[in-house]
Swiss-Prot record:
Domain of life of the native organism: Eukaryota
Organism field: Lychas mucronatus
InterPro entries linked to this entry: LCN-type_CS_alpha_beta_dom (IPR044062), Scorpion_toxin-like_sf (IPR036574), Scorpion_toxinL/defensin (IPR002061)
Tissue specificity statement from the Swiss-Prot or TrEMBL entry: Expressed by the venom gland.
Subunit structure: Monomer (edited version) and heterodimer (non-edited version) of this alpha chain and a beta chain (AC P0CI43).
Function summary: The heterodimer non-edited LVP1 induces lipolysis in rat adipocytes. Induction of lipolysis by LVP1 appears to be mediated through the beta-2 adrenergic receptor pathway (ADRB2).
Keywords: Disulfide bond, G-protein coupled receptor impairing toxin, Ion channel impairing toxin, Neurotoxin, Potassium channel impairing toxin, Secreted, Signal, Toxin, Voltage-gated potassium channel impairing toxin, Voltage-gated sodium channel impairing toxin
Gene Ontology annotations for the cellular component aspect, listed alphabetically: extracellular region
Family: Belongs to the long (3 C-C) scorpion toxin superfamily.
UniProt xrefs under SUPFAM superfamilies: Scorpion toxin-like
The keyword Ribosomal protein is assigned to this record: no
Swiss-Prot/TrEMBL domain comment: Has the structural arrangement of an alpha-helix connected to antiparallel beta-sheets by disulfide bonds (CS-alpha/beta).
Name of the protein in its database record: Lipolysis-activating peptide 1-alpha chain
Domain LCN-type CS-alpha/beta: residue ranges: 22-83
């Protein structure tokens, strides 16, 4: 029984990272983008497209971008790639 748990433990630990892909993008000052209307809205969609992903929405009064990687999280990282 212990052997089975030993083999499945790394899989169980990595599941939350696969299920919750995305993050809050940061502006030029390193702060998250605020939003006024919860759920899907044009402001957050625009912000997420600037950061290189197709979909985002307002969650907890801040823009959340689905499938946003850490390399595109900061505005300046995205800006450097486009120059």
């Amino acid at each position: 029984m212990n052997i089975i748990l030993f083999y499945f433990m790394p899989i169980l630990i990595s599941l939350p990272g696969l299920l919750a892909s995305g993050t809050y993008p940061n502006d030029v000052y390193g702060l998250t983008y605020d939003c006024g209307k919860l759920g899907e809205n044009e402001h957050c969609l625009k912000i997420c497209k600037i950061h290189g992903v197709e979909y985002g929405y307002c969650y907890g009064w801040r823009c959340w971008c689905d499938k946003l990687s850490d390399k595109n999280k900061l505005f300046w990282d995205v800006y450097k790639e486009h120059c």
